[in-house]
Amino acid sequence: MYLSRFKQSGFRNLAPLNLEFDPHVNVFLGENAQGKTNLLEAIYFLAISRSHRTSNDREMIAFGQDFASLAGRVHKRQLDLDLRIVISKKGKSAWVNRVEQARLSKYVGHLNAILFSPEDMELVKGAPSLRRRFMDLEFGQINPEYLYFASQYRQLLQQRNNYLKQLARRQASDQVLLGVLTEQVATAASELIWRRYRYLADLNRYAAEAYRAISGQREELRVLYRPSAKEITAADQPAQIKQKLLDRFAEIADDELRRATTQLGPHRDDLEFQLDGKNAHLFASQGQQRTIALSLKLSEIQLIKQLTGEEPILLLDDVMSELDQNRQAALLNFIHGQTQTFITTTDLDSISQEIVKQPRIFYIHSGQIIEKEEGLNGRRR
């Protein structure tokens, strides 16, 4: 799978673009705050209909514009696709081969993308919300059902929280309605948690392989799901998960009324990374943390390939300078030239010429993008 053409207008600070990409490696060179990250965000949004930087879609519409439009041509083994997504103040609309999709869950998955940014280095020791967002962004693009239940859960959770606030303020008193909302939240939550366990089982295998390949060590990396309802296990089916959630909701009913918010569920769950059984949050060095984060991204590539039969595109946002040459080599050798890769950098010297021999290079300045005529080694393309 690769993206051959990309067009956009009205997205953040980017000038209107119509770019052709190399099927292998594309490098975007420019100083900070010139639009490199915005460009990768736009490509990522075209793929999964969400930003990795904000949950407010309106932020991505350029000042003075009514909407932002993103479009691309995707080549797969069996077919070519034209994708388009429009962000307006009313919401999002998406098209595949000029046919508007009834739901975004029908659109997501036609172009798979893995993005690796400096913020991902915080996956191990950062806030739990980073790890939950990691799961939702990555698992959502490989399974429409996950995306559907995640969206449904967010809506139901908001409704339940709003009603808990009304009860706390004595603006409502109907406990039957609270019971209905609790049942609905538990149903959506159980489906979401069950799918997280399933995908993490596969992700674990690939992440362990990637960690050993990058580090050259025999340490075993494991990724564990830590549900906020501790009674839930990986062996549970959705019906069992739902019942355990309902039992816990009954136990904490008074506390939730006092706090006026839902105290357990997927929005409170977390991931734990272990090296040889030790919690990496507590014991991992900075180098080990970076290797764990990188291993996760590489395992996502393998997982998507397993489930779809296609390599996703890989977006590396200013991370090459964060990696030493050995980790750079491990990263690019791991994808072995079959994954279309987009790299942003402020300095071409941060990218080893031995690793990336003939990329297509673009300059970015004040949102304007032009192609450089020479490769990394100075030869004309």
Curated annotation (Swiss-Prot):
Pfam families in UniProt: SMC_N (PF02463)
PROSITE patterns linked to this entry: RECF_1 (PS00617), RECF_2 (PS00618)
Annotated binding of ATP, by residue: 30-37
MF-aspect GO terms: ATP binding; single-stranded DNA binding
GO BP: any one term: DNA synthesis involved in DNA repair
Listed Gene3D superfamilies: P-loop containing nucleotide triphosphate hydrolases (3.40.50.300), RecF/RecN/SMC, N-terminal domain (1.20.1050.90)
Cellular component terms (Gene Ontology): cytoplasm
Keywords, alphabetical: ATP-binding, Cytoplasm, DNA damage, DNA repair, DNA replication, DNA-binding, Nucleotide-binding, SOS response
Annotated localization: Cytoplasm
Family membership: Belongs to the RecF family.
Function: The RecF protein is involved in DNA metabolism; it is required for DNA replication and normal SOS inducibility. RecF binds preferentially to single-stranded, linear DNA. It also seems to bind ATP.
UniProt name for this protein: DNA replication and repair protein RecF
Gene for this chain: recF
